[in-house]
């Protein structure tokens, strides 16, 4: 595979290999047959990052080969959304003849949405001044006139210049409802929107008919908690990153959801609060004991859950666990399977043509 050519004819084989690998990893835990959710075979990534190569008067996007570290010129990138592919040549064509915009530009990041909005971040090895802002505004206006719904950001050491705003608003159709999600530049968002929709709908189906409240750790911008709110009395969700918490609060209001409470704290801190080990000012006005959480939802980073959080999670009757690293999931399941059984297993092909897998398990406590 090269950045400009996807092995589309191999898609089914690579998905079958992942499915078999997941079966093998989950076999020790008596997991059921996985439900498998396919990705679009091209234009599935909603974001992309490119280094910029200066070659005389020429300017082009490059990536580096992971094995050889050689640079590869990238004029089109079929893994990325069609919107990013349309924008890439127009962006370079506008920057190339402008010495103010191109000087010491070393990277361009794109974040696009199914709703048609896109953020472009230009990264520089130099200070950005008022002259840069004037030229950047002209670039933004030129691309807007070409029909792009675009936000432009300049970044340099300890500098972030936002011409208008640093976010886009995504709209995802989830089980009959359009969900609005504010996505902030340089914050985590699910890279594959089509697969994200399938993940949300699987989680909704897995928790249908739930009783009581939902606790979510690592909620990000509220991707799962807002979609799942319709299945629960109330949702209590934690997140540590300030921009993600702010986006989640906006998303709650934008979707007119009234039963979700977001608190800014790490999963480890929340564990201490639940166990009564520490008190936190951030929890003033929130009565943790009033929540009857029968279900806990976790979507941890690649490192998985730490030992203390595994113990916290294990106390809940139902656990919904989304993992971007089945190896750390397997490690956590060694403990969780002592008390819980896997009722559902899913493979989400979030990262086609790579060895990476995203998966989901629903666990229920044995009686």
UniProtKB/Swiss-Prot annotation:
The active site is at residues 324, 358. It holds the Pfam family tRNA_U5-meth_tr. S-adenosyl-L-methionine binds at residues 190, 218, 223, 239, 299. Its EC number is 2.1.1.-, 2.1.1.35. Dual-specificity methyltransferase that catalyzes the formation of 5-methyluridine at position 54 (m5U54) in all tRNAs, and that of position 341 (m5U341) in tmRNA (transfer-mRNA). GO terms for cellular component: cytosol. It catalyses: uridine(54) in tRNA + S-adenosyl-L-methionine = 5-methyluridine(54) in tRNA + S-adenosyl-L-homocysteine + H(+); uridine(341) in tmRNA + S-adenosyl-L-methionine = 5-methyluridine(341) in tmRNA + S-adenosyl-L-homocysteine + H(+). Keywords: Methyltransferase, S-adenosyl-L-methionine, Transferase, tRNA processing. GO terms for biological process: tRNA methylation. This is tRNA/tmRNA (uracil-C(5))-methyltransferase. One of its GO terms (molecular function) is tRNA binding. Belongs to the class I-like SAM-binding methyltransferase superfamily. RNA M5U methyltransferase family. TrmA subfamily. It comes from Pectobacterium atrosepticum (strain SCRI 1043 / ATCC BAA-672).
């Amino acid at each position: 595979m090269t950045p400009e050519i996807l092995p589309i004819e191999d898609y089914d084989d690579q998905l079958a290999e992942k499915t078999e690998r997941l079966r093998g990893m989950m076999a020790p835990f008596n997991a059921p047959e996985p439900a498998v959710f396919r990705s679009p075979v091209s234009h599935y990534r909603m974001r992309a990052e490119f280094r910029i190569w200066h070659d005389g008067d020429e300017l082009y996007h490059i990536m580096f080969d992971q094995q050889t570290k050689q640079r590869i010129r990238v004029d089109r990138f079929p893994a990325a959304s069609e919107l990013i592919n349309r924008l890439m040549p127009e962006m370079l064509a506008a920057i190339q003849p402008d010495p103010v915009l191109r000087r010491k530009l070393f990277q361009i990041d794109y974040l696009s949405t199914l709703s048609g909005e896109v953020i472009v971040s230009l990264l520089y090895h130099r200070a950005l001044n008022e002259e840069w802002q004037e030229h950047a505004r002209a670039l933004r206006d030129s691309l807007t006139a070409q029909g792009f719904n675009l936000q432009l950001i300049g970044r340099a050491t300890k500098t972030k210049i936002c011409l208008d705003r640093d976010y886009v608003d995504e709209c995802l159709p989830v089980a009959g409802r359009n969900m609005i999600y504010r996505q902030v530049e340089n914050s985590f968002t699910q890279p594959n929107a089509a697969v994200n929709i399938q993940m949300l709908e699987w989680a909704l189906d897995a928790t249908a008919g739930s009783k009581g409240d939902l606790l979510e750790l690592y909620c990000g911008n509220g991707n799962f908690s807002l979609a799942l709110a319709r299945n629960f009395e109330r949702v209590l969700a934690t997140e540590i990153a300030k921009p993600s918490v702010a986006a989640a609060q906006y998303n709650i209001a934008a979707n007119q959801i009234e039963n979700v409470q977001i608190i800014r704290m790490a999963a480890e801190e929340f564990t201490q609060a639940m166990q009564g080990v520490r008190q936190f000012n951030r929890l003033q006005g929130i009565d943790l004991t009033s929540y009857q959480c029968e279900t806990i939802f976790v979507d941890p980073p690649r490192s998985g859950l730490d030992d203390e959080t595994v113990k916290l999670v294990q106390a809940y009757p139902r656990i919904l666990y989304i993992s971007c690293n089945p190896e750390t999931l397997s490690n956590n399941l060694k403990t969780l399977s002592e008390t819980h059984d896997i009722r559902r297993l899913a493979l989400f092909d979030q990262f086609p043509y790579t060895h990476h897998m995203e998966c989901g398990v629903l666990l229920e406590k044995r009686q």
